Regions:
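Glycine-rich loop-to-alpha-helix module at the N-terminal edge of alpha/beta enzyme cores
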Residues: 13-105
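Conserved small-residue-rich beta-alpha loop and adjacent elements
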Residues: 107-181, 254
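ALDH superfamily catalytic-core signature
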Residues: 178, 199, 213-267
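Short beta->alpha connector loops at strand-helix junctions that form conserved
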Residues: 158-160, 188, 248
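Hydrophobic face of amphipathic alpha-helices that form TPR/SEL1-like repeat modules
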Residues: 1-19
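A structured beta-alpha segment of the ubiquitous adenosine-cofactor-binding alpha/beta core
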Residues: 117-118, 185-207
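Hydrophobic packing residues within well-ordered alpha-helices of enzyme cores
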Residues: 94, 167-170, 197, 218
Length: 267
C-alpha cells in the first residue's frame, strides 16, 4: 500500500525493525471475501488434518525460538527472558488448541433420557477476526488464531501496529505448516483497520485482547447488526481486568512499587 507502518526499536527509535503496509477498507473487504469462500472447505477437512497443520506450525516456531525472541526484544522492547517465555507460550497455546479441538470433534454426551439420544456438537462459526496486543505479540495472537483454525474457522489476524513483524512470523509459520493462505490472513494497520474488520458483515466472531476502551467499542460495533448479516456476531474480549492491585495503607512502598512493575510486565 502507499501508506506504511515503520516498526522501530523502542530502545533505539532510529533503528528500523520492520516495515508493513496499512490495510485499507478495500483490503479488509477482500480478505473477508476470500476467507468466506475458503472456509467451508477447511471446515470439511478432518479435525486430525487441521490439527496436524497446527502441530507443524508449532514445531516451526519451536525451531525458530531464539530468532523470534530476538525479534520481540527489538520490536517491542521485551527483556530476553520475557521474550523467550512469550515464544514458548505461543507454542503452548497452539498445541493446547489442537488438543481441545480434537477432544470436541466427536461432540459431548448430554443427559440421556428414555427414548432420547442427546449429544452436543460444536460447529465452526465462519470467519474470525483476531485482534492482538503489542505487549505479548506472539503468545496472545497465537492463542486467538489457533483456537479458530483448529475448530474449522477462517481467521484474519490484525496485529498491534507496534508489532507487525511478530504477527507476520506467526502467519508465516501457520502457512508453512499447511494452513491455506485464505484461511489465515494478516491485515496490519492502525485502529481504522481493526474497526473496518469488526464492522464487516461477513465476520462472525471477534477475538480481542487489549485496552478497555477499544474492547467496549468492539462490543458496541458487533451489536449493530447489518441487514447484510444472517448471524449475530460473537465477541471474546479480554481487557486486562485481571490486573487489579490492592495496596494496604501499611504496605512497604519501597517493596510494593518494584513488585507491581514486575507483575505488570512479567510472567
Amino acid at each position: 500500500t502507499a501508506d506504511g507502518i515503520d516498526s522501530t526499536d523502542p530502545g533505539r527509535p532510529d533503528r528500523l525493525v520492520a516495515r508493513a503496509g496499512v490495510a485499507s477498507p478495500g483490503d479488509v473487504a477482500d480478505a473477508v471475501d476470500r476467507a468466506t469462500r475458503a472456509q467451508p472447505a477447511w471446515a470439511r477437512r478432518p479435525p486430525q488434518e487441521r490439527a496436524e497443520a497446527l502441530r507443524r506450525a508449532a514445531n516451526l516456531l519451536r525451531a525458530e525460538r531464539h530468532t523470534l525472541a530476538a525479534l520481540q526484544v527489538r520490536e517491542c522492547g521485551k527483556p530476553w527472558a520475557e521474550a523467550d517465555a512469550d515464544v514458548c507460550e505461543a507454542i503452548d497455546h497452539i498445541e493446547y488448541a489442537v488438543h481441545q479441538a480434537l477432544s470436541l470433534a466427536d461432540g459431548k454426551p448430554l443427559l440421556q433420557l428414555p427414548g432420547e439420544r442427546n449429544q452436543l456438537r460444536y460447529r465452526p462459526r465462519g470467519v474470525v477476526a483476531a485482534i492482538g496486543p503489542w505487549n505479548f505479540p506472539l503468545a496472545i495472537p497465537a492463542g486467538l488464531v489457533a483456537t479458530g483454525l483448529a475448530t474449522g474457522n477462517a481467521v484474519i489476524l490484525k496485529p498491534a501496529e507496534q508489532a507487525p513483524a511478530s504477527g507476520h512470523r506467526l502467519v508465516q509459520a501457520l502457512r508453512r505448516g499447511g494452513v491455506p493462505d485464505d484461511i489465515i490472513q494478516l491485515l496490519p494497520g492502525y485502529g481504522e483497520t481493526g474497526a473496518a474488520l469488526v464492522a464487516h458483515p461477513g465476520v462472525h466472531t471477534i477475538a480481542f485482547t487489549g485496552s478497555e476502551p477499544v474492547g467496549l467499542s468492539i462490543i458496541r460495533a458487533a451489536a449493530d447488526t447489518s441487514h447484510e448479516q444472517r448471524h449475530v456476531k460473537r465477541v471474546v474480549a479480554e481487557m486486562g481486568g485481571k490486573n487489579a492491585i490492592i495496596v494496604d495503607s501499611d504496605a512497604d512502598l519501597d517493596q510494593v512499587v518494584p513488585d507491581v512493575l514486575r507483575s505488570a510486565f512479567a510472567f
